[in-house]
Amino acid sequence: MNRMEKIFSGLKTEIEQQGLNVFGIVLYSSENEKYINLWSENKRRNIFSAAKTFVSIAIGICVDEGRLTLEDSILEFFPEYKPYASSGTEKITVRNLLQMASGKAIHRFPKDISDTDYALLFLRESLTTEPGTVFYYSNACSYMLGRVIEKVTGNTLCDYLIPRVFNKLGILNPEWSTCPQGHTIGATGLALTTEELARLGVLLMNGGSYNGQNIVSNGYIKSMTTDCICAKELHSEYPKSMADYGYHIWVNGERNIYWAWGKQGQYCIVVPWLNLVISVTARLEPDSNAILDTIMKLI
């Protein structure tokens, strides 16, 4: 039994012994070795905040295409809202949004608001810290990045990614939730199978390429997984991360591991030094780090 088989077997055993409500696990190696175990029907499910990493990939492609830079002020993309923006909002950059360091303590938008543009709500929210200095996990940051992409491409986030990423990964006709105004939510609401989620990890592990096609630059992937902000604590509704945060991706620099993470046990974990990708879809209630903790022990 090789190392990958041992990790797969150990993870499968731990999931079953702990009685975790896992839908499926997929392991890939760089040699296209693949192991799959499904406990339920192989269908697309909401990967929750693991979707955020696709937002980052979209930003990287926009950078590659010369449509924006990470140092651009997000307010410059919304000239119509400049008169309403709170003081200091002009300091918030694309990079700040990627690192969840906008300086605004707004996590998500109220569900009962349907007649006001979410972008306006974000821009007029007051700053609580200097942009770029303090991590504050925020679905609003991901949403705003999607709106920036719309501004520079003329397409919704989802539509922009279809020919550039989803089709190339074999993720056909993706479904991604929208806000009341019809803009891709970005932060959550993307439905994928466990294997489709794993393809994101293969793209990252290969430095921005998949099946020989370059999708996003290797330089962006390196920055995405190394340019981090300290993120040891999350909101009380989430388990502690014990990691730092790159460009919409969690990073454990000491272990040289990074991952996309959605609540209730959605993971796409990349272990570069093992040439290994592990994806998991689940519904863990209450939410916990049980799956990630198990994987950390096995590797």
Q: Residue locations for each model-derived region?
A:
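A short, well-structured edge-of-sheet supersecondary motif
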Residues: 7-41, 268-269, 275-279
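Short, charged, amphipathic alpha-helices and their helix-cap/turn boundaries
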Residues: 29, 33-34, 75, 107-131, ...
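Flexible glycine/proline-enriched surface loops and loop-helix/loop-strand junctions
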Residues: 40, 126-130, 141-143, 179-185
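Active-site SXXK
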Residues: 46-71, 97, 145-149, 197-200
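Active-site-proximal alpha-helical segments within enzyme catalytic domains
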Residues: 144-148, 186-209, 266-281
